[in-house]
């Protein structure tokens, strides 16, 4: 029996050390090294030239709701088209590696609403709306209907006076 225990222990250690682990690769939609202000400046210039607004998604690779939103938009052609047609998009990182504090301060500390949080800037870079994403959720994800309504209500054309006659 004394000889059997070391053999079993050795076999156990060997099997554990050779066991394959299948870990899901980390999702990286946000770039902690990105210059957020420069990205916003480029998006604002493009938006102004194209009569669009800027859609900023603030979050991080650590945030499951941020990933879910990103995946939903990319997997739903109608949402992707609506976003691309009406907005210049910026993914603004907030993480321990880079909290982008100066940029988020200028944007009125949107993280107070949780993550992801969505910001709409006009073609001059002025913040015109901050959206708590919780209001766009349904069940364990976001609602396509609610997101569609949100994006339609804050696009460039929706805010033109001629489109708002009562």
Regions found by a protein language model. Give the residues of each.
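Bacterial Sec-dependent N-terminal signal peptides
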Residues: 1-22
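Structural alpha/beta surface segment adjacent to cysteine/selenocysteine redox centers
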Residues: 95-115, 124
């Amino acid at each position: 029996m004394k000889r059997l225990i070391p053999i079993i222990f050795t076999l156990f250690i060997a099997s554990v050390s050779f066991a394959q682990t299948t870990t899901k690769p980390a999702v990286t939609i946000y770039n902690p090294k990105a210059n957020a202000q420069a990205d916003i400046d480029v998006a604002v210039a493009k938006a102004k030239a194209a009569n669009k607004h800027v859609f900023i998604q603030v979050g991080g690779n650590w945030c499951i709701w941020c990933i879910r939103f990103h995946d939903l938009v990319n997997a739903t052609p109608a949402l992707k088209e609506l976003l691309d047609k009406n907005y210049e998009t910026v993914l603004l990182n907030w993480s321990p590696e880079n909290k982008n504090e100066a940029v988020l301060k200028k944007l009125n500390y949107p993280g107070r609403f949780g993550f992801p949080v969505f910001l709409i800037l006009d073609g001059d870079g002025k913040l015109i709306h901050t959206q708590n994403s919780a209001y766009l959720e349904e069940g364990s994800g976001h609602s396509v209907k609610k997101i569609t309504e949100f994006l339609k209500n804050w696009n460039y054309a929706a805010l033109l006076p001629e489109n708002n006659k009562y």
